[in-house]
Amino acid sequence: METNGKALSGYRFLTLLERPELKAAAASWFHEKWGVPDEAYLACMTAYLSGETEYGWYLCLDGERIVGGLGVIENDFHDRKDLAPNVCAVYTEEDCRCLGIAGRLLDLAVEDLRAKGVSPLYLVTDHVGFYERYGWEFFCPAQGDGEPEPTRLYIHR
């Protein structure tokens, strides 16, 4: 796949299980993007790497640089605790956007968890139109913890 002059095949897509030595760097990277404490990411990643949970962490590397990533957790800070697990912390570096990286990461997470018998997946977002391109459907509104307005909750079946 070639987009914006750079081949997507030039990037490496992987689970954190494939490169567990990236745990600290990945936690720091997600913290920089979302402001959630490193410790929260480290706890979730450690649970994944130790086999406590099948909910994974997925990265895109350009060489050794993390340029995209996302995680899967029980609940992404909203009131619909019955809708789990949730994709969280989806992010692609600005200089790598519009190449299909986030879509590939989303597909990787869906395929990985489906192979483990985990389906459907959910996510909360204010973006309209982006996730639909990758098979996600609007499911219902959800109230984010501490948020004044409801947000959109999507499902991938």
Regions inferred by a protein language model and the residue ranges of each:
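Helix-loop element at the rim of GNAT/NAT acetyltransferase active sites that forms part
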Residues: P20, A27-A40
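Conserved active-site alpha-helix within GNAT-family acetyltransferase domains
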Residues: A115-S119, T125-P150
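Conserved acetyl-CoA-binding loop-helix of GNAT-fold acetyltransferases
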Residues: T92, C98-E111
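Active-site rim helix/loop that mediates acceptor-substrate recognition in acyltransferases
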Residues: W34-L61, V67
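Conserved N-terminal entry element of GNAT/NAT acetyltransferase domains
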Residues: M1-A24, R157
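Conserved beta-strand in the GNAT
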Residues: L59, R65-N75, N86, Y91
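Short hydrophobic/aromatic beta-strand or adjacent loop that forms the aromatic wall/cage
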Residues: Y55, P148-Y154
